[in-house]
């Protein structure tokens, strides 16, 4: 008999998604709903530092490579399971919108947190 928990759709926690987007949007906010967080600026670093701390607080292993790319890893399927990577960026175009890149980062975290909340046992990390 199939595991109904594994096969049933799980919804992303909209409250979590909104809260994380609100927080990351503080870094470089123009105050009028816009965002200015170009790469390698203090606002970009602050957003990266916040996101790294957010992942660590949720039990992820956080790595930063030689050029500053930020990686979060959590083992949900065992040490030998294949890995799925989700990527985006926390910097923005000058005067880009609040969803410029950051939404992909935040949505990836929220998706993985959905697996954890729903006790889904994925076949990959």
Q: Over which residues does each language-model region extend?
A:
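Structural signal for hydrophobic packing residues in well-ordered secondary-structure cores
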Residues: 21, 25-28, 32, 58-59, ...
């Amino acid at each position: 008999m199939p595991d109904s928990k594994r096969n049933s759709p799980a919804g992303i926690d909209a409250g979590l998604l909104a809260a994380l987007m609100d927080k990351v949007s503080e870094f470089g906010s123009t105050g009028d709903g816009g965002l200015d967080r170009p790469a390698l600026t203090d606002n970009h670093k602050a957003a990266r530092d916040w996101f790294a701390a957010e992942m660590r607080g949720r039990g992820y292993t956080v790595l930063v490579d030689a050029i500053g790319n930020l990686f979060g890893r959590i083992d949900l399927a065992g040490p030998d399971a294949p890995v799925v990577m989700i990527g985006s960026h926390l910097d923005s175009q000058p005067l880009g919108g609040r969803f410029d890149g950051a939404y992909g980062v935040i949505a990836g975290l929220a998706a993985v947190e959905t697996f954890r909340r729903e006790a889904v046992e994925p076949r990959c990390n």
